[in-house]
Amino acid sequence: MKKIKKLLTAGLFCFTCIAEAQQIQTDRPNETESPAVITTRHIQIESGFSFEKEDDDKTFEVPNAVFRYGVFKNAEIRIESAFKIDHQEQEQHSGIEPLIVGAKYHIANHKGLIPDLALLARVSIPWLADNAFQEPKYSPEIRMLAQHELSKSSHLGYNMGVKWLAETAHPEYIYTLSADHALTKKIKLVAEAYGYAESHHHAQNTADIAVLYVLQKNMQLDIMAGSNIMHSPQQKFVEIGLSYKL
């Protein structure tokens, strides 16, 4: 796992290439994934640091990161990883969570009532992790991503999908709804609600708000805070991140 750690660290801080002029678009910091894909032969690194508290348990991700690469006009491939520190009542675990590999394909552009559409598929690889976080099974996921342009400064996005859980191989259904509004050319506000639901179980619902700040056309800073709602444990979280397009 040392090689993965070295690659992750190098990727987060290797911001020396020149980016193209198009303004950066990211999938972070919220759960709703954008239908936008990375420009061909460009790399985008989306990294962040998060803190989550549920009762007396605390979890840190320092950092989490997504590496996205545009393979051709409408498609990208991606690798996701995170170094996790898990504080429980009488024990602590730390290490790299299972590596996630995937791809996104842009299907249609926004036109009239038809939203921007894309398909995202990814899978977590159980053995590409430190011992404390290895999982018993692969965990594939597929989502349909959509976004409506309400105005030049406002958008409404949503995802629908299913993920097969690593512990049980049972399906877990995913739904997200996100609205954003650009206050200026550099500052955007985002509000979101999302949930996960297994058959015969109450959905785990969450709400969050975020602020995105464009430092340069190819660099974005974000901060997000949220909490579980309704039939969910008392859980609060905060995250700050930096994204860079090469």
Q: Where are these predicted regions, by residue range?
A:
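Cleavable N-terminal export/targeting peptides
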Residues: 1-27
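Transmembrane beta-barrel domains of Gram-negative outer membranes and organellar outer membranes
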Residues: 21-246
